[in-house]
Curated annotation (Swiss-Prot):
Keywords of this entry: Antiport, Cell inner membrane, Cell membrane, Chloride, Ion transport, Membrane, Transmembrane, Transmembrane helix, Transport
Catalytic activity: 2 chloride(in) + H(+)(out) = 2 chloride(out) + H(+)(in)
Periplasmic side: 68-74, 140-145, 231-250, 308-327, 375-384
Family, per entry: Belongs to the chloride channel (TC 2.A.49) family. ClcA subfamily.
GO molecular-function term, one example from the UniProt record: voltage-gated chloride channel activity
One of the record's GO cellular component terms: plasma membrane
Selectivity filter part_1 (motif): residue ranges: 104-108
Protein name, entry field: H(+)/Cl(-) exchange transporter ClcA
Residues carrying the site annotation Mediates proton transfer from the protein to the inner aqueous phase: 201
Subunit architecture: Homodimer.
Gene behind this protein: clcA
Locus of motif Selectivity filter part_3: 353-357
Compartments, as annotated in UniProt: Cell inner membrane
Lineage of source species: Bacteria, Pseudomonadati, Pseudomonadota, Gammaproteobacteria, Enterobacterales
Summary of the function given for this chain in its UniProt record: Proton-coupled chloride transporter. Functions as antiport system and exchanges two chloride ions for 1 proton. Probably acts as an electrical shunt for an outwardly-directed proton pump that is linked to amino acid decarboxylation, as part of the extreme acid resistance (XAR) response.
Length: 467
C-alpha cells in the first residue's frame, strides 16, 4: 500500500511542477508577470526592512562604542573619527573593487537599465550596495537609504526574472521598473509615491502600458505590506497634525517655491561640480578613492559628535526643525552646513541616496522661511511647520524635477494631506523657476555623464585594439 502511495504522490508533484513550469513558460501571460511582480515586491520589501535595520544596528553600535569612552574627551573625538572613517572606507572599497555601478544613488543606473543602456549585474550589485550602504550610512554620512533601495529593488526584479527564465524584453523592463518602485515604497512607507516616481521621474524610460502599470501596482502593494508588517502603519516622519493654510497666505507658499526654484539648480551645479573635483583628486586610483572616502566619513563622525543635526540622513532632524525648536539663524546655519556635507558625501561616489538629505534641507529652509513670515505677519498666526512640509517637497521638485512625486511623498510620509494645496503651489513655483533658469534634472544629468564616460571608455578600448 505504501509502495503505491509514494509513486502516486510523486506523480502528482511532478504534474503540479509541470503545470507551474508551463504557466511560467507561456509568453505574454499577464498572470505570470503579476505573480513575478508580487514576488519582486515581497523581496524588495524584505530587503528594505533588512537594510534599514542593518544601518540602525551599525549606527547604534558606533554610538554605543563612543559612549563607553565619553569620559575621556580626546579619546572620544579620536574614536569618532576612526569608527566613521573605517566604516566609510569599507563602503567605498566594496564599490570600487567589486561593483562600481553600485556607487552613488543608483537611480540613474536604473534609468539607464530601463533604456537598455546600462547593464544590470544583480549578483554583485545587491551585496555591494547592501553592505557598502551599511558602512557609509552607518558611519553617519549625509546620505539616504532610498537610492540604494531603488537600485536594489530594480536588481531584485532582474534577479527574479533570471531565476524564472523570462527572456522577453518587455518582462525584463516591467520587473526592473516594478522592483525600483517597490524599493522606494519600502524605503519611505509611501506606496503611491513609489508608483508616481516611476511614472514621473522615469517617464522617458518607462514603457507605460496596462501590464506594466499593473505589475508596478502589485509590487508596490506587496513591498508596502511587508514594510508595515515589520514597522507598523504609522507615518515615517511624525510632525503631528498641522493646521491648514488659509487662502490669504497662499502667496507666501508661492514665494517659498520661487526661493527653492533658485536653490534647486544651484544645488545641482554644486553636486555635479564637486563630482568633477573628486574625479580629478582620485583620478580613478582605488587607494586614493578609499582614503578620500575615509576622510569624508571621519569628518562626518566628528561633525555628528559636535552637532548631530548636521550629520546623518536627516530623518531625525525633520520633526525637530518642523516643530520650530531652532531659531531662524540656527536653521540657516544647519542648512548651509548640511548643503556642504550633502554635496561632499553624495558627490564622492559613496553608496547612498540623496532623497532624504534633500528632504531635510527643504525642511530647514522652509521652516526658517515660515518662522520669518510668522514674525513679519503676527496677526495671521502662521504655523512654521506648514512651510517646513511645503519646503520638503519643493527642493526635490526643483532638483529632480518630479513635483508630483515630491508632493505625494511628503504627504504620505507626514500624514498631513490637508496641506496638499500649499504643497502644489510651492512645488509648482519651484519647478517653473528651476526650468526657467535652465536647470536640468539631477538624475538625468548624472545618467548622461555616466553614458558619456561609458562611451569614451568603449572608444578608448576600440582604439587600443586597432593600434
Amino acid at each position: 500500500m505504501k509502495s503505491q502511495t509514494i509513486p502516486t504522490r510523486r506523480v502528482r508533484g511532478f504534474r503540479r511542477a509541470a503545470v507551474i513550469r508551463q504557466l511560467l513558460s507561456r509568453d505574454k501571460t499577464p498572470l505570470t508577470i503579476l505573480l513575478l511582480a508580487s514576488l519582486t515586491g515581497v523581496l524588495a520589501g524584505l530587503a528594505g526592512v533588512a537594510f534599514e535595520k542593518a544601518v540602525a544596528w551599525v549606527t547604534a553600535h558606533r554610538i554605543e562604542g563612543l559612549a563607553q569612552v565619553a569620559h575621556i574627551p580626546w579619546l572620544v573625538w579620536l574614536l569618532a573619527f576612526l569608527f566613521s572613517a573605517l566604516l566609510a572606507m569599507v563602503g567605498y572599497f566594496l564599490v570600487r573593487r567589486f561593483a562600481p555601478e553600485a556607487g552613488g544613488s543608483g537611480i540613474p543606473e536604473i534609468e539607464g537599465a530601463l533604456e537598455e543602456l546600462r547593464p544590470v549585474r544583480w549578483w554583485r550589485v545587491l551585496p555591494v550596495k547592501f553592505f557598502g550602504g551599511m558602512g557609509t550610512l552607518g558611519a553617519g554620512m549625509v546620505l539616504g537609504r532610498e537610492g540604494p533601495m531603488v537600485q536594489m529593488g530594480g536588481n531584485i526584479g532582474r534577479m527574479v526574472l533570471d531565476i524564472f527564465h523570462r527572456p522577453d524584453a518587455e518582462a525584463r523592463h516591467t520587473l526592473l521598473a516594478t522592483g525600483a518602485a517597490a524599493g522606494l515604497a519600502a524605503a519611505f512607507n509611501a506606496p503611491l509615491a513609489g508608483i508616481l516616481f516611476i511614472i514621473e521621474e522615469m517617464r522617458t524610460q518607462f514603457h507605460y502600458n496596462l501590464i506594466s502599470i499593473k505589475a508596478v501596482f502589485t509590487g508596490v502593494i506587496m513591498s508596502t505590506i511587508v514594510f508595515r508588517i515589520f514597522n507598523g502603519e504609522k507615518s515615517v516622519i511624525e510632525v503631528g497634525q498641522l493646521t491648514d493654510a488659509p487662502v490669504y497666505t497662499l502667496w507666501l507658499y508661492l514665494l517659498l517655491g520661487i526661493i527653492f526654484g533658485a536653490v534647486g539648480p544651484l544645488f545641482n551645479r554644486l553636486v555635479l561640480g564637486m563630482q568633477d573635483v573628486f574625479a580629478r583628486i582620485h583620478g580613478g586610483n582605488t587607494t586614493r578613492w578609499v582614503l578620500l572616502g575615509g576622510a569624508i566619513g571621519g569628518a562626518c563622525g566628528l561633525l555628528a559628535l559636535w552637532e548631530p543635526a548636521a550629520a546623518g540622513g536627516g530623518f531625525g532632524l525633520i520633526p525637530i526643525a518642523a516643530a520650530g525648536n531652532f531659531t531662524v539663524g540656527m536653521l540657516l546655519f544647519i542648512f548651509i552646513a548640511r548643503v556642504v556635507t550633502t554635496v561632499f558625501c553624495f558627490s564622492s561616489g559613496a553608496p547612498g541616496g540623496i532623497f532624504a538629505p534633500m528632504l531635510a534641507l527643504g525642511t530647514l529652509l522652509g521652516s526658517a522661511f515660515g518662522m520669518a513670515c510668522a514674525a513679519w505677519f503676527p496677526q495671521w498666526h502662521l504655523q512654521a511647520g506648514t512651510f517646513a512640509i511645503a519646503g520638503m517637497g519643493a527642493l526635490l521638485a526643483a532638483s529632480v524635477r518630479a513635483p508630483i512625486t515630491g508632493i505625494v511623498l511628503v504627504l504620505e510620509m507626514t500624514d498631513n494631506y490637508q496641506l496638499i494645496l500649499p504643497m502644489i503651489i510651492t512645488c509648482l513655483g519651484a519647478t517653473l523657476l528651476a526650468q526657467f533658469l535652465g536647470g536640468k534634472p539631477l538624475y538625468s544629468t548624472i545618467l548622461a555623464r555616466t553614458l558619456a564616460k561609458q562611451e569614451a571608455e568603449r572608444q578608448a578600448q576600440a582604439d587600443g585594439r586597432n593600434t
